[in-house]
C-alpha cells in the first residue's frame, strides 16, 4: 500500500468527520427551531385556557398528567423572592413554591472581563429554566404553586454552610418548613422538609422535584454540543433524552439514579436518595419540557414532627473536581462521545498536568509531547519507511517508465524491489491509524472541558474559542505543508494535486476549531516534522 494513498484516505476520513460535525450543527438547529415552531402553533389555545388553573402541572403519583406548567407571568412581579449568595452561587428563590427561579454562577462571567455572571436557571421569557419542588397530595400539602413565607429576603454564606428556610402553614395548622442547604465550595443544593403534623390523622406524604425549561435559542455555535435531558439508572446506564422524545419516554421506577437538563459546559441535575426507589418521568407541556422525580411515600403520625429529605440539586459546571463525588455516573454528563474510554484518561492527565504548571496552554503542549513520546517507536518506523520510499522514488519511476503498459509485471517488479530493499510500504499506516482515535478523543475533551472556557494563553483569551486572528490555523497549515514535503511525492499527478490542496483545506477547517485543539495539532505537526527530519538526515548520511 502506497503511503501517500493511505494519507489521502486518512485525510478523506477526517474531512468526512469534520463535515459530519458541521451537518450535526445545522441539523440540530433546524430540528430545535422546528420543535419550537410546531409546539407554539399547536398549543396557543391550550396556553390561554390553562393559565386560569395553576395546579394542573403538579405531578401525579399514579398516572401521567400532560397538563400545562408555566411560570405564572401574570403575578410574578407581585410575589417576593429571597436572594441567596454563596461562594459559588447566587440564587433567587421565589416565595411561590420556594422555586429556584434564577441561578448565577459566581466564578463564570458571561464574557471575559465582564461583571455579569453566567445565568444557568432563569425566569426570562427567552429562557425558561427552573427547579421546582413540592409535596403531595395536592390540597393538603404545599406544592410548587403554594405561597411560602421567609424571615429574610437576603442570605449570604459567611461560614462553611448555610440553611435557608421557608415556612408554609395549612388551615388546620400543619406546619411545613422547606429548607435549602448550601455548603462551601459546592454546587450541590440540598432540599428537605420539616413537617409538624398538628392533626389527629396520620399524614401520608410524597415529595417531588422537577426541572422545567424551554428549548434555548441557538447561538450559532460552530462546534456541536448536546442540549437536552439525561438520566442515569440503577443498572449504571446513562441515557440522553432528546427534547423531541420527552413525551415518548415511559414512566420508570428504580433505586437511586438521577435526571438532568444538560447544555454546553453546564447542567442541572436532580439527585434523590441513592438508597430509595424513585419514579422518573419526562413530558412535554406545550413548549416546555419537564423532568420529574417523585420520591416514595412517607407517613407522619399525629402530633409528630418529621424531616423528609427530598433531593439534592446540582447547579453548576461540568467540572470534574466538583462532580466526581456527587453521585454515581454524574461524570457522564461530560460528553466525550463514543471514545469515552480514551477521552476520560486524556482529560484526567490534562487536569493533572494543569495542577502542576497552572497553564492550560502549556498543559496541552506537554500532553501533546507525552502522546508523541507514547507513539515514538511507531512513528519512527513509519518515518523510516517513508524515508526509504523517498530514496526508492527514482527507481520506482524508472520501473513505471519501463513496465507502465503491463500493470501485472509492474506490480511484480515493484514488490521485488520492496523486498530487496527491505521496505514495507504499509508500515507507515499503523501510527496514523492509531492516532486517529486519540485525535478524535482529544477533540471531544477540548470541546467539553469547561476548564478551558475563557482560559488565556499567549495572545489568546479563550482556548475554547476559535483563534480570532487565525494565527494558529495558519501555522498549522504551514506545518502540514512542510510535513508533506518531507514525504515522497505520489506518482499519480492527480493524487499529487489533491495532497497539495490538503493543507489549505485543513487550514480552512481549523479556522473554526477551538484554539486549544488547533494548538495540539500544530505542536504535534512540529514535533513530527522534527522527528522525521532527524530520521531522514540519519538515513541520508
Curated annotation (Swiss-Prot):
Gene Ontology CC terms, in alphabetical order: plasma membrane
Q: Pfam families, per this entry?
A: 60KD_IMP (PF02096), YidC_periplas (PF14849)
Q: Which UniProt keywords apply?
A: Cell inner membrane, Cell membrane, Chaperone, Membrane, Protein transport, Transmembrane, Transmembrane helix, Transport
Annotated GO biological processes are: protein insertion into membrane; protein transport
Question: Which membrane topology term applies here?
Answer: Multi-pass membrane protein
Kindly give the Gene3D superfamilies that the UniProt entry links to this protein: 2.70.98.90
Gene Ontology molecular function terms on file: membrane insertase activity
The record's subcellular locations are:
Cell inner membrane
Q: Which residues cross the membrane?
A: 6-26, 356-376, 430-450, 463-483, 498-518
InterPro entries membership = Membr_insert_YidC, Membr_insert_YidC_N, YidC/ALB3/OXA1/COX18, YidC/Oxa/ALB_C, YidC_ALB_C, YidC_periplasmic_sf
Q: Taking the first listed entry, what is the main subcellular location of this protein, grouped into a coarse class? A: membrane
How does this polypeptide assemble, per the annotation? Interacts with the Sec translocase complex via SecD. Specifically interacts with transmembrane segments of nascent integral membrane proteins during membrane integration.
Function description: Required for the insertion and/or proper folding and/or complex formation of integral membrane proteins into the membrane. Involved in integration of membrane proteins that insert both dependently and independently of the Sec translocase complex, as well as at least some lipoproteins. Aids folding of multispanning membrane proteins.
Q: Which family does it belong to?
A: Belongs to the OXA1/ALB3/YidC family. Type 1 subfamily.
Q: What is this protein called?
A: Membrane protein insertase YidC
- Origin organism of this chain? Vesicomyosocius okutanii subsp. Calyptogena okutanii (strain HA)
Q: What is the lineage of its organism?
A: Bacteria, Pseudomonadati, Pseudomonadota, Gammaproteobacteria, Candidatus Pseudothioglobaceae
Amino acid at each position: 500500500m502506497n503511503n501517500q494513498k493511505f494519507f489521502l484516505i486518512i485525510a478523506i476520513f477526517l474531512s468526512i468527520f469534520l463535515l459530519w460535525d458541521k451537518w450535526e450543527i445545522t441539523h440540530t438547529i433546524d430540528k430545535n427551531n422546528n420543535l419550537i415552531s410546531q409546539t407554539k402553533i399547536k398549543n396557543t389555545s391550550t396556553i390561554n385556557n390553562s393559565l386560569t388553573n395553576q395546579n394542573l402541572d403538579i405531578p401525579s403519583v399514579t398516572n401521567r398528567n400532560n397538563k400545562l406548567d408555566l411560570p405564572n407571568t401574570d403575578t410574578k412581579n407581585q410575589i417576593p423572592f429571597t436572594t441567596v449568595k454563596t461562594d459559588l452561587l447566587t440564587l433567587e428563590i421565589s416565595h411561590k413554591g420556594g422555586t429556584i427561579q434564577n441561578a448565577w454562577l459566581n466564578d463564570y462571567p458571561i464574557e471575559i472581563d465582564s461583571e455579569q455572571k453566567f445565568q444557568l436557571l432563569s425566569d426570562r421569557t427567552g429562557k425558561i429554566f427552573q427547579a421546582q419542588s413540592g409535596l403531595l397530595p395536592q390540597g393538603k400539602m404545599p406544592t410548587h404553586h403554594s405561597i411560602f413565607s421567609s424571615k429574610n429576603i437576603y442570605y449570604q454564606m459567611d461560614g462553611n454552610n448555610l440553611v435557608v428556610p421557608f415556612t408554609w402553614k395549612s388551615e388546620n395548622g400543619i406546619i411545613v418548613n422547606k429548607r435549602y442547604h448550601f455548603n462551601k465550595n459546592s454546587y450541590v443544593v440540598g432540599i428537605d422538609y420539616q413537617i409538624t403534623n398538628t392533626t389527629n390523622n396520620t399524614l401520608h406524604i410524597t415529595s417531588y422535584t422537577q426541572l422545567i425549561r424551554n428549548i434555548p435559542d441557538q447561538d450559532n455555535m460552530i462546534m456541536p454540543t448536546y442540549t437536552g435531558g439525561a438520566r442515569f439508572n440503577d443498572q449504571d446506564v446513562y441515557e440522553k433524552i432528546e427534547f423531541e422524545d420527552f413525551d415518548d419516554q415511559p414512566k420508570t421506577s428504580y433505586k437511586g439514579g438521577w435526571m438532568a437538563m444538560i447544555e454546553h459546559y453546564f447542567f442541572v441535575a436532580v439527585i434523590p436518595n441513592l438508597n430509595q426507589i424513585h419514579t422518573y418521568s419526562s413530558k412535554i407541556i406545550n413548549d416546555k419540557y419537564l423532568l420529574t422525580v417523585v420520591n416514595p411515600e412517607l407517613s407522619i403520625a399525629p402530633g409528630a414532627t418529621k424531616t423528609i429529605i427530598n433531593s439534592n440539586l446540582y447547579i453548576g459546571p461540568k467540572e470534574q473536581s466538583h462532580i466526581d463525588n456527587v453521585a454515581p455516573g454524574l461524570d457522564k454528563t461530560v460528553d466525550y462521545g463514543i471514545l469515552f474510554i480514551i477521552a476520560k484518561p486524556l482529560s484526567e492527565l490534562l487536569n493533572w498536568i494543569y495542577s502542576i504548571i497552572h497553564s492550560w496552554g502549556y498543559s496541552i503542549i506537554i500532553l501533546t509531547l507525552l502522546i508523541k513520546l507514547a507513539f515514538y517507536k511507531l512513528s519512527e518506523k513509519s518515518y523510516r519507511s517513508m524515508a526509504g520510499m523517498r530514496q526508492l522514488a527514482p527507481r520506482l519511476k524508472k520501473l513505471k517508465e519501463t513496465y507502465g503498459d503491463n500493470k501485472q509485471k509492474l506490480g511484480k517488479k515493484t514488490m521485488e524491489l520492496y523486498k530487496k530493499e527491505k521496505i514495507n510500504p504499509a508500515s507507515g499506516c499503523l501510527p496514523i491509524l492509531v492516532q486517529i482515535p486519540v485525535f478524535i478523543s482529544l477533540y471531544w475533551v477540548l470541546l467539553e472541558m469547561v476548564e478551558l472556557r475563557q482560559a488565556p494563553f499567549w495572545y489568546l483569551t479563550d482556548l475554547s474559542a476559535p483563534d480570532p486572528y487565525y494565527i494558529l490555523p495558519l501555522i498549522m497549515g504551514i506545518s502540514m505543508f512542510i510535513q508533506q514535503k518531507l514525504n515522497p511525492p505520489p506518482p499519480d499527478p492527480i493524487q499529487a494535486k489533491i495532497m497539495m490542496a490538503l493543507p489549505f483545506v485543513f487550514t480552512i477547517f481549523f479556522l473554526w476549531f477551538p484554539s486549544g485543539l488547533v494548538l495540539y495539532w500544530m505542536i504535534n505537526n512540529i514535533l513530527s516534522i522534527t522527528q522525521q527530519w532527524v530520521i531522514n538526515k540519519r538515513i541520508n548520511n
